[in-house]
Each structure stands twice: as structure tokens, then as C-alpha cells.
Amino acid sequence: MKLIDTTIAVDHLRGEPAAAVLLAELINNGEEIAASELVRFELLAGVRESELAALEAFFSAVVWTLVTEDIARIGGRLARRYRSSHRGIDDVDYLIAATAIVVDADLLTTNVRHFPMFPDLQPPY
């Protein structure tokens, strides 16, 4: 399973060719594409009215994960561990990282500096 963060979703929705290729390859390879409900929140918070239909179509293609107690607890631990040394990481990113850990998914993001808890993380494009 691949867990996408908001950067991948935004790139895809904005027509970034590399994001479209990445998601198409994952689908063609039978890979499950998941995202945290927090990604849905961030996308809905920033969408223009003219983009709502495309956003809803995107939503239907993704498996959505809820924020569970385990995710909240692990996210809290990650925030305590990294907040003082990695300023600028918001709480949503800690919870997305915790989601990847709990559901045992590979995190896909272009914003690797917000995920120091995954030292080998590289942007997918």
C-alpha cells in the first residue's frame, strides 16, 4: 500500500505530469493508493469551487484512512520527538506519518523535510 500526502494529491489535481504518471503506474501495478482523512480535509480547505468536481472524482479513487487512537498516540510521540529539532512541521504531517506507520504503508510525498522520522524517504518524482 502507498500512502499519499497532500503534496502528491495537489500535484495530481493541478495536472503535474510526474504526479499523473506516478499514480497511473501505481494503479496499473495493482497498488492500493491510500490517504489520511486529513489529506481530504486539507484538499477541501484549499479547493476552488471550479475544482470541486475533479476533487470529488479524485476522492473516489483513493482508499481513505481514519485517524484512530493508535495514529493519534504515535503522532503525538513523533511530534514530541521532532518538534524542537525540526521546526515548521505541522500537526497534520505528524499524523500522516503516524498513519503510514500504523497501516504499514510506504509514504509518498514531495515534502520530505516534513518527515524526518523516515530518514530514507525520497520524493517519488
UniProtKB/Swiss-Prot annotation:
Keywords: Hydrolase, Magnesium, Metal-binding, Nuclease, Secreted, Toxin-antitoxin system. Its EC number is 3.1.-.-. It comes from the Bacteria. Residues 3-122 form the PINc domain. One of its GO terms (biological process) is negative regulation of growth. One of its GO terms (cellular component) is extracellular region. It is found in: Secreted. The keyword Acetylation does not apply. Belongs to the PINc/VapC protein family. This is Ribonuclease VapC19. It comes from Mycobacterium tuberculosis (strain ATCC 25618 / H37Rv).
